[in-house]
Every structure is written in C-alpha cells, then in structure tokens.
Regions:
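Structural recognition of an alpha-helix C-terminal capping motif at a helix-to-coil junction
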Residues: 51-58, 73-85
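Arg/Lys-rich amphipathic alpha helix in sigma70-family domain 2
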Residues: 66, 81-102
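Extreme N-terminal regulatory/targeting segments of RNA polymerase sigma factors
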Residues: 1-14
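Amphipathic, Lys/Arg- and hydrophobic-enriched alpha-helical face
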Residues: 28-47, 63, 136, 181, ...
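DNA-recognition helix of helix-turn-helix
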Residues: 88, 131-132, 143, 149-152, ...
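Sigma70-family region 2
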Residues: 17-18, 57-74
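Short, charged helix-capping/linker segments at alpha-helix termini
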Residues: 3, 17-25, 36-55, 168, ...
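Amphipathic alpha-helical segment used for protein-protein interaction
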Residues: 14, 18-21, 95, 109, ...
Length: 193
C-alpha cells in the first residue's frame, strides 16, 4: 500500500482496472476529504453525505471497470462533478433546490485537522470558523458554493468551473463578489479574523 501512495491518479486507475483493489483504496484515501467535505456542504446531512459519497465511488468503479474513463490526469475534477451531479439529483428527487450549508450535527470544520494546539487556540479557531460559517450562510448560493469549493475543497477555478457547469471567468467573478460581500459582513459585524 505504501508504494501505491506515490503513484499518480492515472497509475492507480490503471492498476485498479488491471485488478488491483488496493489501488482503488489508495484513490479513495487520497480524495475522500475533499469529496466528502464538498458533498457535506451541499447536502447539510452527514448520513446523506456518506450515502452520496459511496454512490460517487460506485459510479467511479462502474465507469472504470467498463473502460469508459478517459479523463487522464483529471480524476478529482471528474469525481467532484459526479458528486455535484448526485447532490443535484438528490435535491431534484425531493423537489428542493440545492443549497450549500454546513451540517448542524457535525461541524464541517471538524473535518479540517487541527494541529496539537492548546485548548484555548482550538476554541478560538472554532469561534472564528463559526463566525465565517454564519457569514457564508448569508451569501448568495452561487458565491457561497465557489468559496466553499475553493477554500475547503481546495479546488482550482478550472475544477470549480467544471463542477458547477460554468465558465472559469464566472467562477472567478463569483469568488470575487463573494469575498467582497464577506468583507462587508465582517465590517458590519466588526469582526476581525
């Protein structure tokens, strides 16, 4: 397994299609945090996020086994697009529009690992994250989605554009206006982060 960690996504996919199940496990481990975090922000329910996360990898496995995977070097954006589409499908089924929110029962910022900080530092970080989360909720959905995908899922603007089905310039514009609006909210609330 240690040898697989150093392989590229493309190499892992090739190994998996040749029958190496550990290669798939390495892919899951490599990308699970970004995928799960993005899904959780979209659906706001940790159990639903886990279900969708599993569905994403079921689709990935089916596609790779059938030989239809062709996006060399673009595994994560492709997987994020599948996750986004499955979230949209879920909301269509329940006749709701997709929203991006954090989970009430599991703080999404808990997914981000803190270093061995003191209890006071951890508490201050949690308070800051809570304030940012409250301000993110006040942003328009399209701006909130781009900020979340950029900062918490660590996606490039090209990947964000592919995942949200918009142009790179549109994603950049949403990010710009989202950050401007966040700054305005910080000034209004007199918050320094």
């Amino acid at each position: 397994m240690k040898a697989l960690v150093k392989k590229t996504d493309h190499e892992l996919i090739q190994l998996f299609t040749d029958g190496n199940l550990e290669a798939l496990e390495a892919l899951v481990i490599r990308h699970k945090d970004k995928l799960y975090t993005s899904i959780l922000f979209l659906v706001k329910d940790k159990y639903l996020a886990e279900d969708i996360f599993q569905d994403v990898f079921i689709r990935i496995i089916d596609t790779m086994r059938s030989g239809r995977y062709t996006e060399e070097g673009k595994f994560l954006p492709w997987a994020m697009r599948i996750a986004h589409n499955l979230c949209v499908d879920h909301f269509r089924k329940v006749k709701r529009t997709p929203t991006i929110r954090n989970s009430e029962d599991k703080d999404i910022f808990e997914v981000l690992n803190f270093t061995d900080d003191s209890a006071e530092t951890v508490m201050m970080k949690r308070q800051s994250h809570h304030r940012v989360r409250e301000m993110l909720e006040r942003l328009p959905e399209d701006q909130r989605e781009v900020i979340i995908l950029r900062h918490y899922a660590d996606m490039s603007f090209k990947e964000i554009a592919a995942a949200t089905d918009c142009s790179i310039n549109t994603a950049l514009g949403r990010m710009r206006y989202g950050l401007i609006n966040l700054r305005k909210l910080m000034v209004q609330k007199q918050i320094a982060l």
